[in-house]
Curated annotation (Swiss-Prot):
Single GO cellular component term: endoplasmic reticulum
Disulfide bonds: 78-81
GO terms of biological process kind: protein N-linked glycosylation; protein N-linked glycosylation via asparagine
Extra information: Present with 1080 molecules/cell in log phase SD medium.
Name of the protein in question: Dolichyl-diphosphooligosaccharide--protein glycosyltransferase subunit OST6
Transmembrane portions of the chain: 189-209, 217-237, 268-288, 303-323
Record's keyword terms, sorted: Disulfide bond, Endoplasmic reticulum, Membrane, Signal, Transmembrane, Transmembrane helix
UniProt function note: Subunit of the oligosaccharyl transferase (OST) complex that catalyzes the initial transfer of a defined glycan (Glc(3)Man(9)GlcNAc(2) in eukaryotes) from the lipid carrier dolichol-pyrophosphate to an asparagine residue within an Asn-X-Ser/Thr consensus motif in nascent polypeptide chains, the first step in protein N-glycosylation. N-glycosylation occurs cotranslationally and the complex associates with the Sec61 complex at the channel-forming translocon complex that mediates protein translocation across the endoplasmic reticulum (ER). All subunits are required for a maximal enzyme activity.
GO MF terms held by the record: protein-disulfide reductase activity
Record-linked InterPro entries: OligosaccharylTrfase_OST3/OST6
Residues in the signal sequence: 1-24
């Protein structure tokens, strides 16, 4: 019995020693890998450290950007690679600063510097952006970049510089919340500024001088301003925390959602504007025939013109509604 107890104690001591040694080795490997990060949190893969890095780190997401900084054998460079690399480093820096608790490692590998990666992944072109999720604890020893499953980000020239789209892609996979800063778009600002100034000057110089009762006009505008958001879905947008402007994969503004049970914030204003225009045209159609200072022939021409414009706007309204409800039967 005494010898049996001694054997059990020795066996437990050996197991504890092996566990402590393996834990220390794993910790040592993590520390060694983390020291390779640059200022934005990205690790550059070389031919020397590739065997170590390609085995991954337990519990960490591996975000791998495969690029070509120089030229290929034909002397051609990869412009898409250069364009996306700025986006890659920018988003990596945002995640490093805003979500330090997230267990992830960003890697950049140049196919000219690490040809073994090209053979392992059987690459035919560049660039590629892949994300390896952490391996299960019992399968960590089998984890390798060349054999493990991954998520792939679609890289095309249209989204190469879109930090918001790439940040959203990673945030969903890593299950984190980040805010990607956007560069100030001068061209877009000038466009909206000029448009607003034209409308403002037109109202000030043309509309207001002809208004005798300005208080009544402002009261009507205020009433419409309160009424229209209510009937066009402002509360729905507010309750569901829907963003005001949504963009598609090509960074274009989506003015209408593809379903009658959902809407974007911008739809409040687009639908309100269509209601206002059609209401104004209907009112003008009623009052134009009653204008005495205009000849009967001119009143007839104006009425016909307003009717055509109203028909056009209603047809446009129906075409927008078909985006929401493609099965709507009345189309003209």
């Amino acid at each position: 019995m005494k010898w049996c107890s001694t054997y059990i104690i020795i066996w437990l001591a050996i197991i504890f020693h092996k566990f402590q040694k393996s834990t220390a080795t794993a910790s040592h490997n993590i520390d060694d890998i983390l020291q390779l990060k640059d200022d934005t949190g990205v690790i550059t893969v070389t031919a020397d450290n590739y065997p170590l890095l390609s085995r991954g780190v337990p519990g960490y997401f591996n975000i791998l950007y495969i690029t070509m900084r120089g030229t290929n054998s034909n002397g051609m460079s990869c412009q898409l690679c250069h364009d996306f690399e700025k986006t890659y480093h920018a988003v990596a820096d945002v995640i490093r600063s805003q979500a330090p608790q997230s267990l992830n490692l960003f890697f950049t590998v140049d196919v000219n510097e690490v040809p073994q990666l090209v053979k392992d992944l059987k690459l035919q072109n560049v660039p590629h952006l892949v994300v390896y999720p952490p391996a299960e604890s019992n399968k960590q020893s089998q984890f390798e970049w060349k054999t493990s499953p991954f998520y792939q980000y679609s890289l095309v020239p249209e989204n190469a510089e879109n930090t918001l789209q790439f940040g959203d892609f990673l945030a969903k996979i890593l299950n984190i919340s980040i805010t990607v800063p956007q560069a100030f778009n001068v061209q877009e600002f000038v466009y909206y500024f000029v448009a607003c100034m034209v409308v403002f000057i037109f109202i000030k110089k043309v509309i207001l001088p002809k208004v005798t009762n300005k208080w009544k006009l402002f009261s009507m505008i205020l009433s419409l301003g309160i009424l229209l958001p209510s009937i066009t879905g402002y509360k729905f947008v507010e309750m569901n925390a829907i963003p005001f402007i949504a963009r598609d994969a090509k960074n274009r503004i989506m003015y209408f959602s593809g379903g009658s049970g959902w809407q974007f914030g911008i739809e409040i204003f687009s639908v309100s504007l269509m209601y206002i225009v059609m209401s104004a045209l209907s009112v003008l159609l009623i009052y134009v025939p009653k204008i005495s200072c205009v000849s009967e022939k001119m009143r007839g021409l104006l009425s016909s013109f307003l009717a055509c414009v109203l028909f056009y706007f209603f047809s446009y309204f129906i075409s927008c509604y078909l985006i929401k409800n493609p099965g709507y039967p009345i189309v003209f």
